[in-house]
From Swiss-Prot:
Pfam families, alphabetized: GMPPB_C, NTP_transferase
GO BP: GDP-mannose biosynthetic process
UniProt source species: Pichia angusta (Yeast)
Pathway: Nucleotide-sugar biosynthesis; GDP-alpha-D-mannose biosynthesis; GDP-alpha-D-mannose from alpha-D-mannose 1-phosphate (GTP route): step 1/1
Name this polypeptide is given: Mannose-1-phosphate guanyltransferase
Family that this chain belongs to: Belongs to the transferase hexapeptide repeat family.
Compartment(s) of residence: Cytoplasm
Reaction(s) catalysed (UniProt annotation): alpha-D-mannose 1-phosphate + GTP + H(+) = GDP-alpha-D-mannose + diphosphate
An MF annotation (GO) of this entry: GTP binding
GO cellular component: cytoplasm
E.C. designation(s): 2.7.7.13
Function recorded in the entry: Involved in cell wall synthesis where it is required for glycosylation. Involved in cell cycle progression through cell-size checkpoint.
Keywords for this protein: Cell cycle, Cytoplasm, GTP-binding, Nucleotide-binding, Nucleotidyltransferase, Transferase
């Protein structure tokens, strides 16, 4: 089995974090985002994984090669000299992806879910088509391209309707596919879209199906969705009684869904949770309140600070009695001084904030 992960470009939507690291290496749930996908592919039986990269490939290579042995996979980097869209990378990696006749998983590196890849493969093999799209149900389909099914053949896709004005369905493309290698023959070696150019051909041939995704789904490519995805991920761990989570018997855990690295130090009288991730070597002072936030490694939250709906970047410091909220994102090595209020600030790396930021803005 083979898998291709569309890693993509600059990660501008997740700045300022991506000014320091490529987006797939930003920790989500205390692991690089892309590692969730590599693990899922390995668990589904993939032995060859291709990462389609066009930004800082050398950083990615250094960071991810170590995982080959751990997961028993071969990781190859397919470096695009120009962005090739969502279909071009398949053509670029054709030699690996078509080396045998087994199906190919394609994953978008921004998507977080429970990755039911074995069930997906079983479904794909059973229907006999050329490709399967994973579909997820949404509350507001008018924001998306919606999947419309054939009335007579279950799960066969009849057409796509982009941002429908009238209700035609509520299933959308979840950014996960399984394809037969022959699909690559439909793709030209140029920047091209699998959604807008390849899939319509398969629809016409009546060879494209959809598979309903159970559980949660989120594109975590921007800060507010990163935090929403974190909540869904932690809730899923709670349902599984995962031993990754910090025990609710700890006196500082407030409301559950808390994931704290064992190396982090927590002060007295803290209330942490619900929905909090704290990375390695973080120091949390006394009387700190953290809710719905991620604190990345080597950061310090000083006594009596309040942190809500915030991502605190690596090696950052939040001062005593400071208050952060409103989807604030601190880049790497940011210092927020004592008693400072930040609401929705996006703070670039290596900055020091000594004045209140009362309205959402970029701090350069």
């Amino acid at each position: 089995m083979k898998g291709l992960i569309l890693v993509g470009g600059y990660g501008t939507r997740l700045r300022p974090l991506t000014l320091s690291l490529p987006k797939p290496l930003v920790e989500f749930g205390n692991r690089p985002m892309i590692l969730h996908q590599i693990e899922a592919l390995a668990n589904a039986g993939c032995t060859d994984i291709v990462l389609a990269v066009n930004y800082k490939p050398e950083v990615m290579v250094g960071a991810l090669k170590q995982y080959e042995k751990e997961y028993g996979v071969s990781i190859t980097f397919s470096v695009e000299e120009e962005p090739l869209g969502t279909a071009g990378p398949l053509k670029l990696a054709e030699k690996i992806l078509k080396k045998d006749n087994t199906p190919i998983f394609v994953l978008n590196s921004d998507v977080i879910c429970e990755y039911p890849l074995r069930d997906l493969l079983e479904f794909h093999t059973a229907h006999g088509g050329e490709a399967t799209i994973v579909a997820t149900k949404v509350d507001e389909p008018s924001k998306y391209g919606v999947i419309v099914h054939d009335r007579d053949v279950p799960n066969l896709i009849e057409r796509f309707v982009e941002k429908p004005v009238e209700f035609v369905g509520n299933r959308i493309n979840a950014g996960i596919y399984v394809l037969n290698p022959s699909v690559i023959d439909l793709i030209e070696m140029r920047p091209t879209s699998i959604e807008h150019e390849t899939f319509p051909i398969l629809v016409e041939q009546k060879k494209l199906y959809s598979f309903d995704l159970p559980g949660y789904w989120m594109d975590v490519g921007q800060p507010k969705d990163f935090l929403s995805g974190m909540c869904l991920y932690l809730s899923a761990l709670t349902k599984k009684n995962s031993n990754l989570l910090t025990s609710t018997s700890e006196e500082y855990v407030n409301g559950g869904n808390v994931l704290i690295d064992p190396s982090a130090k927590i002060g007295k009288g803290c209330k942490i949770g619900p929905n909090v991730v704290i990375g390695p070597n973080c120091i949390i002072g006394d009387g700190v309140r953290i809710q719905r936030s991620t604190i990345l490694k080597n950061s310090q939250i000083k006594d009596h600070a309040w942190v809500k709906s915030t991502i605190v970047g690596w090696n950052s410091t939040v001062g005593k009695w400071a208050r952060l909220e409103g989807v604030t994102v601190l880049g790497e090595d940011v210092t927020v001084k004592d008693e400072v209020y930040v609401n929705g600030g996006k703070v670039l790396p290596h900055k020091s904030i000594k004045d209140n930021v009362e309205t959402p803005q970029i701090i350069m």
